[in-house]
């Protein structure tokens, strides 16, 4: 059974002992392990059921620690670090030779982030080194935004969970690749949008070239067990069934089944999206219908998660 705590020192010692700790960040809860202990890193892959070809993000307390993991920190990287760290931005940089191959999935790059959540930073300070921390859920399942979500995912495992409350951002970090010989690339959409990143870089961000350099790039991801269907035109016939759940983004229609309205503000919607999926997925429904928000840049990360969580979009 999982154990939920707010004892930072207990969690830090647990990590030093090579064990796993679920820790809060401002994006989602992460399944943390010592990034320099091979056995601990393998435990992360095993517990999540995550393929070893999927690289991990190393979480750091301060930007100054990035040089311990990255072989080169370009002026572009320095500008992004200064602008957005601590915060929901991951940078993919050339890896130092000593970084574990299990962390990088055998690649010559490493993904780094400095989280903004105060308890994550306290834990990183107490631990004293980098932590890998992919989302604290079974592979491809809904990412957790509360300690209770993590406990649901690992209800039969003796996992220590550091309770830092609800995650403020609610969607995984934006990921930018800055590798030598390649243009800057936006590998994963987050609530830190393309335009803000480009403004700091002073150049365009290209999309991924298809190589899996970072988490969250697989097509099917972040998905509930209940079939999820995205819609723009309301499927009115489905409103009459108590076995259909609904997630709305503004003006909602009356329905017989349970409904959650996350509103028309993208930041508020993102912060509550995974929690809404957890809530409806627990009700043994036939389907979850999700209203697709407007196609604007502010909603880009939400659209990305909808495309990966839903079986169909219409």
Regions found by a protein language model. Name each.
Residues 1-314:
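Active-site-adjacent structural elements in enzyme catalytic cores
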């Amino acid at each position: 059974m999982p154990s939920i705590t707010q004892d930072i020192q207990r969690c830090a010692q647990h990590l030093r002992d090579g064990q796993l700790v679920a820790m809060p960040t401002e994006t989602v809860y992460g399944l943390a392990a010592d990034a320099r202990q091979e056995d601990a890193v393998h435990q992360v892959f095993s517990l999540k059921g995550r393929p070893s070809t999927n690289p991990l993000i190393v979480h750091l307390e301060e930007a100054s620690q990035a040089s311990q993991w990255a072989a080169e920190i370009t002026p572009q990287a320095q500008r992004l670090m200064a602008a957005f760290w601590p915060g929901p931005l991951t940078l993919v940089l050339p890896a130092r030779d000593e970084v574990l191959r299990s962390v990088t999935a055998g690649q010559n790059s490493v993904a780094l982030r400095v989280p903004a959540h105060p308890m994550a930073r306290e834990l990183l300070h107490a631990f004293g080194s980098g932590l890998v921390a992919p989302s604290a859920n079974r592979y491809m399942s809904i990412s957790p935004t509360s300690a209770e979500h993590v406990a649901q995912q690992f209800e039969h495992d003796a996992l220590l969970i550091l309770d830092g409350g609800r995650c403020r951002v609610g969607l995984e970090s934006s990921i930018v690749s800055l590798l030598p010989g390649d243009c800057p690339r936006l590998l994963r959409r987050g609530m830190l949008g393309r335009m803000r990143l480009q403004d700091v870089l002073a150049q365009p961000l290209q999309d991924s070239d298809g190589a899996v350099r970072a988490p969250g790039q697989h097509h099917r991801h972040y998905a509930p067990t209940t079939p999820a269907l995205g819609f723009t035109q309301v499927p009115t016939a489905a409103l009459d069934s108590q076995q259909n759940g609904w997630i709305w983004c503004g003006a909602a229609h009356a329905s017989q089944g349970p409904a959650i309205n996350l509103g028309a503000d993208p930041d508020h919607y993102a912060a509550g999206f995974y929690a809404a999926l957890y809530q409806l997925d627990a009700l043994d429904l036939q389907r979850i219908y999700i209203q697709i928000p407007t196609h604007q840049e502010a909603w880009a990360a939400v659209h990305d998660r909808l495309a990966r969580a839903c079986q169909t979009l219409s």
